[in-house]
Amino acid sequence: MAKMMGPRFKMCRRLGLNVVGHPKAMKRADRGTSRADKKLSDYGIQLLEKQRLRAYYGVMERQFTRYVDQAFNSKEQPGEALLMILESRLDNMVYRMGFASSIRQARQMVNHGHFLVNGKKVNIPSFRLNIGDEVVLREKSRKTEMFVNNFKDSIGSEVPYVSKEEDNFKGIFTRKPKREEIPITIQEQLIVEFYSK
């Protein structure tokens, strides 16, 4: 499976955005060290925004392009449709539900088969959830203290389009998120403009 490689904190500083969720990721960021601090052309600004979004969700270029095509072919506004596609990925929803402390960790957990989706084992991070789908931490995986602590510590801090059943280690994708509810600082219209050329 292809992975996004390279120093993660350095990537965050280069993009001018904490895309890994670690509190120290931007600690050494000085003025002038990120692309966001430099004067860019319109194309450069659009490209940077695309790279930020792709890095945030940990998606490779080819897959990201497929998502963009799907968004443009949908009946919704392309930028919001793209965010909805990315947000509904299993690895992201595992993170949003509080099973993992980062999308990167969530992807590893999914790869290792720690979850059931609607009662069936799914180990594909890019698997797309539908509204109403249930994600459950497998019984044997509940013996891992880190997984249990992640989930219990996140109770009350989940996004509004997710509900959780603490006793059952279950998360439910309850509804389509509103744009303002998705906790990511991205100007998706710039990405739409980038791919509209």
UniProtKB/Swiss-Prot annotation:
GO terms for biological process: ribosomal small subunit biogenesis; translation. It comes from the Bacteria. SMART domains: Ribosomal_S4, S4. One of its GO terms (cellular component) is small ribosomal subunit. Residues 88-150 form the S4 RNA-binding domain. One of its GO terms (molecular function) is rRNA binding. InterPro entries: Ribosomal_uS4, Ribosomal_uS4_bac-type, Ribosomal_uS4_CS, Ribosomal_uS4_N, S4_RNA-bd, S4_RNA-bd_sf. Keywords: Ribonucleoprotein, Ribosomal protein, RNA-binding, rRNA-binding. Pfam families: Ribosomal_S4, S4. CDD domains: S4 (cd00165). Part of the 30S ribosomal subunit. Contacts protein S5. The interaction surface between S4 and S5 is involved in control of translational fidelity. Belongs to the universal ribosomal protein uS4 family. One of the primary rRNA binding proteins, it binds directly to 16S rRNA where it nucleates assembly of the body of the 30S subunit. With S5 and S12 plays an important role in translational accuracy. PANTHER family: 30S 40S RIBOSOMAL PROTEIN, SMALL RIBOSOMAL SUBUNIT PROTEIN US4M. This is Small ribosomal subunit protein uS4B. It comes from Clostridium perfringens (strain ATCC 13124 / DSM 756 / JCM 1290 / NCIMB 6125 / NCTC 8237 / Type A). The gene is rpsD2.
